[in-house]
């Protein structure tokens, strides 16, 4: 009796465990399934999906049209949009009747990028009724670089359905995640300034140590070439005077002075005619 009871308990536990695992698997949220066999996806695409991970928990909406032709587009990055049962990454909802159309699904995701943009494509949407050879819909989301926002400005751009095949819905969105990493580098002026400051520091410290340890100087005399720096102002003034002046400083006078001994006695009658009569 005991072996049978033990087997029955073990079987019940295994059954409950299987049900729990199944429920957990069903409730687990779907994510992007890149094109290609499992484990053989492009490493570049996997890196781009990881790069967009901060957007996984965000949902984006945009409303277009008017009246009975008003549609709401709901988009999520590598997460289910809409009713969470169709595996859709982007859906279209007719506002007048609430009909939901899957534009693209997560299980057919393709992603690539350029210098300042990322292109996310969801394929496998609901089939067209009369357009594009009744092929499945496809969503193309162009994520452009905008360093001032994590994600914003999700808007539909156009729907290309005038072709026999390869039709698509085009959307755009801004995100800082699409921007290339900023490469910080010093300008030429900064490099020269750093170099000059380094040379000055080496000169002052090295000269100070030399004056103190080798020469045995004390106080202000430890500063290297102290006499030169004290007289620098005069040297600069002399140099400016030499460069800027066009004539020598001591120019001989163009006239010669007359001494008192060379002056004759003036006649007192010279101005008599100016006196009033």
UniProtKB/Swiss-Prot annotation:
One of its GO terms (cellular component) is lysosomal membrane. One of its GO terms (molecular function) is transmembrane signaling receptor activity. It is found in: Lysosome membrane. Glycans are attached at residues 57, 83, 94, 107, 113. Residues 30-181 form the MRH domain. InterPro entries: Man-6-P_rcpt, Man-6-P_rcpt_cation_dep, Man6P_isomerase_rcpt-bd_dom_sf, MRH_dom. It is a single-pass type I membrane protein. Residues 1-26 form the signal peptide. The chain crosses the membrane at residues 186-210. It comes from the Eukaryota. Gene3D superfamilies: Mannose-6-phosphate receptor binding domain (2.70.130.10). One of its GO terms (biological process) is receptor-mediated endocytosis. Its main location: membrane. The extracellular domain is homologous to the repeating units (of approximately 147 AA) of the cation-independent mannose 6-phosphate receptor. This receptor has optimal binding in the presence of divalent cations. Transport of phosphorylated lysosomal enzymes from the Golgi complex and the cell surface to lysosomes. Lysosomal enzymes bearing phosphomannosyl residues bind specifically to mannose-6-phosphate receptors in the Golgi apparatus and the resulting receptor-ligand complex is transported to an acidic prelyosomal compartment where the low pH mediates the dissociation of the complex. Homodimer. Binds GGA1, GGA2 and GGA3. This is Cation-dependent mannose-6-phosphate receptor. The lineage of its organism: Eukaryota, Metazoa, Chordata, Craniata, Vertebrata. The gene is M6PR.
């Amino acid at each position: 009796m005991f072996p049978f009871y033990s087997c029955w308990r073990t079987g019940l536990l295994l059954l409950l465990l299987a049900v729990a695992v199944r429920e957990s698997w069903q409730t687990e949220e779907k994510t992007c399934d890149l094109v290609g066999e499992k484990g053989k996806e492009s490493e570049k695409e996997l890196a781009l999906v990881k790069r967009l991970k901060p957007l996984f928990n965000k949902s984006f909406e945009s409303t277009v049209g008017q009246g009975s032709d008003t549609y709401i587009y709901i988009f999520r990055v590598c997460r289910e949009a809409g009713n969470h049962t169709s595996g859709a990454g982007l859906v279209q909802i007719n506002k007048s009747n609430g009909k939901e159309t899957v534009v693209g699904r997560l299980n057919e995701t393709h992603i690539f990028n350029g210098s300042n943009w990322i292109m996310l494509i969801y394929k496998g949407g609901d089939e067209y009724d009369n357009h594009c050879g009744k092929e499945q819909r496809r969503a193309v989301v162009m994520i452009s670089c905008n360093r001032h926002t994590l994600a914003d400005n999700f808007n539909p751009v156009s729907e290309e359905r005038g072709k026999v095949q390869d039709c698509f819905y085009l959307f755009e969105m801004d995100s800082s995640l699409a921007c290339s990493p900023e490469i910080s580098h010093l300008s030429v002026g900064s490099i020269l300034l750093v170099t000059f400051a380094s040379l000055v520091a080496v000169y002052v410290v090295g000269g100070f140590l030399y004056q103190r340890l080798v020469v045995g100087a004390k106080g202000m005399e430890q500063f290297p070439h102290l006499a030169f720096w004290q007289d620098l102002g005069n040297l600069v003034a002399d140099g400016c005077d030499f460069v800027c002046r066009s004539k020598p400083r001591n120019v001989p006078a163009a006239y010669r002075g007359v001494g008192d001994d060379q002056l004759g006695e003036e006649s007192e009658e010279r101005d008599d005619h100016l006196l009033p009569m």
